[in-house]
A protein has these predicted regions:
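Polysaccharide-binding and catalytic clefts of secreted carbohydrate-active enzymes
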Residues: 1-78, 82-106
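Hydrophobic targeting/anchoring helices
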Residues: 70, 74-77, 82-204
């Protein structure tokens, strides 16, 4: 570790976005944190009445805290002990609402990573929120470096000029290190259509 392996890249760790995340420890942790029963108020996740705003805020705050404590923090600490950086990105980090249900809010995770990262997909300009959240946290906690898994979904016909345009948008908003998506050993089977382009010998 450390030479030549510099870090560990995590790709889209997330909670169950198809429903509400659950853990056997969640009810006790909720009551300890907020002083009232999770069980008695679960229905407020689906009904807009009473103290539903407060309950939802506290529910998602706790879910995010538990995800950070049981995944991001242990991985980050392991990386530090082994001379590595924790980098990569989480799922749905480009939307403020989506990131709550996918990881409990992204910025707390970024603060625990030695090299926060994003996933910049597509041949397009995205919302500046994606880059600015990572850059903001990195400047406060991690020295200002931000990694981007970039150029995925830009298509087989993407030009170097277009790639420069995509990268320019990211770097103007605080991203400092590209991680090209992707370099496959072969294009056989489904890989040919796996979010092109590739950055390997197959691409002229």
């Amino acid at each position: 570790f450390g030479d030549p392996i510099k870090g560990v890249f995590t790709d889209e760790p997330q909670l169950n976005c198809a429903g509400y995340p659950w853990s056997v420890g969640l009810p006790d942790a909720f009551e300890k944190a907020y002083g009232y029963s999770l069980w008695d108020n679960l229905w407020l996740l689906a009904a807009d009445c009473g103290e539903y705003r407060r309950f939802r805020y506290e529910f998602w705050q706790l879910v995010g805290d538990m995800f950070r404590q049981t995944f991001t923090l242990p991985v980050s600490q392991w990386c530090e002990r082994n001379g590595l950086v924790m980098t990569g990105h989480f799922a749905c980090e480009d939307g403020l609402c989506d990131q709550i249900s996918s990881c409990g809010g992204i910025m707390g995770h970024y603060a625990l990573m030695q090299l926060p990262g994003i996933d910049y997909l597509g041949n397009r300009v995205t919302s500046p929120v994606l880059m600015k959240q990572a850059a903001s946290v990195s400047r406060q906690f991690n020295g200002g470096e931000v990694l981007s898994e970039t150029f995925g979904c830009s298509g087989w016909g993407v030009t170097l000029a277009r790639l420069a345009w995509i990268w320019g948008w990211q770097s103007a908003l605080g991203v400092t290190k590209p991680c090209f998506h992707l370099a496959a050993f072969t294009m056989e089977g489904r890989r040919k259509r796996d979010y092109p382009a590739f950055f390997s010998y197959q691409e002229p």
